[in-house]
């Protein structure tokens, strides 16, 4: 037999009403959680039982959801009522103008202007404000100077490191150059010794052609002498 349809009206029996509330509340919380997860929705649910007990669920922060709801409601009201939106912006403009005037007035007072009606207490408060401003300015200046000094020290350390690396490379290149010169000088000395030894070696006789050239030279000299 099929389940009968429940009439949507207040349940008179207190026990049945509490049981139904517990079941429906659990299902509602489950659906809200599923909606937030499946649809990536920002969900906030608040339920008060007939006894005043609070039950709630929020996918993120309940406070942020409520604030967002209130802002959306105000925006919706402004869209529905253009005159209300115009008044809102008029109030904003008036507030901003007043803030600008106050800033100009305070600035003139800090410069020593418009203080003719000041009492001793007012002047003391203004002096304290100026001293606090100067203290903040000095602290900011000291902070910036310290940061600049730190940057310069870091750059100096980097330059020293680069110079050290260049000095090492120069020493290596200089040492290699010295070794290369030694090898070249050693090779030249060996070649000179070989040439000298070859010219002084008696074991190496002249070729017949060289002997003939020498004889011809001697004959030519004798002919010159006879003439």
From Swiss-Prot:
Composition-biased stretches, type Basic and acidic residues, lie in 198-227
Q: Can you name a GO cellular component term? A: nucleus
Which SUPFAM superfamilies does UniProt cross-reference here? SRF-like
Q: Which GO terms describe its molecular function?
A: DNA-binding transcription factor activity, RNA polymerase II-specific; protein dimerization activity; RNA polymerase II cis-regulatory region sequence-specific DNA binding
Per UniProt, the ranges with Polar residues bias are 186-197
Q: Which UniProt keywords apply?
A: DNA-binding, Nucleus, Transcription, Transcription regulation
Say if the entry is tagged with keyword Hydrolase.
no
Superkingdom of origin organism: Eukaryota
Tissue specificity comment: Expressed in seedling roots.
- Residue ranges constituting the K-box domain according to the UniProt record: 86-176
The record's listing under InterPro entries reads:
MADS-box/MEF2_TF (IPR050142), MEF2-like_N (IPR033896), TF_Kbox (IPR002487), TF_MADSbox (IPR002100), TF_MADSbox_sf (IPR036879)
**Where's it found, cell-wise?**
Nucleus
* Function as written in the Swiss-Prot or TrEMBL entry: Probable transcription factor.
User: What name is this protein filed under?
Assistant: MADS-box transcription factor 25
Organism of provenance: Oryza sativa subsp. japonica (Rice)
Name of the gene this protein is made from: MADS25
């Amino acid at each position: 037999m099929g389940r009968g349809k429940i009439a949507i009206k207040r349940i008179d029996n207190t026990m049945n009403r509490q049981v139904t509330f517990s079941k429906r509340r659990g299902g509602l919380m489950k659906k809200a959680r599923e909606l937030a997860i499946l649809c990536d929705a920002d969900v906030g649910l608040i339920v008060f039982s007939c006894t005043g007990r609070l039950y709630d669920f929020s996918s993120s922060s309940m406070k942020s959801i409520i604030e967002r709801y209130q802002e959306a409601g105000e925006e919706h009201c402004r869209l529905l009522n253009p005159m209300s939106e115009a008044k809102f912006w008029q109030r904003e403009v008036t507030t901003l103008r007043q803030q600008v005037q106050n800033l100009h007035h305070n600035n003139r007072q800090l410069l020593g202007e418009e203080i003719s009606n000041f009492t001793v207490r007012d002047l003391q408060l203004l002096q304290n404000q100026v001293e606090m401003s100067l203290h903040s300015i000095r602290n900011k200046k000291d902070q910036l100077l310290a940061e600049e000094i730190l940057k310069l020290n870091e750059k100096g350390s980097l330059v020293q490191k680069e110079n050290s690396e260049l000095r090492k490379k120069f020493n290596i290149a200089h040492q290699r150059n010295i070794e290369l010169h030694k090898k070249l000088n050693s090779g030249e000395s060996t070649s000179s010794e070989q040439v000298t030894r070859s010219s002084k070696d008696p074991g190496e006789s002249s070729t017949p052609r060289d002997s003939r050239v020498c004889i011809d030279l001697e004959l030519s000299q004798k002919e010159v002498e006879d003439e």
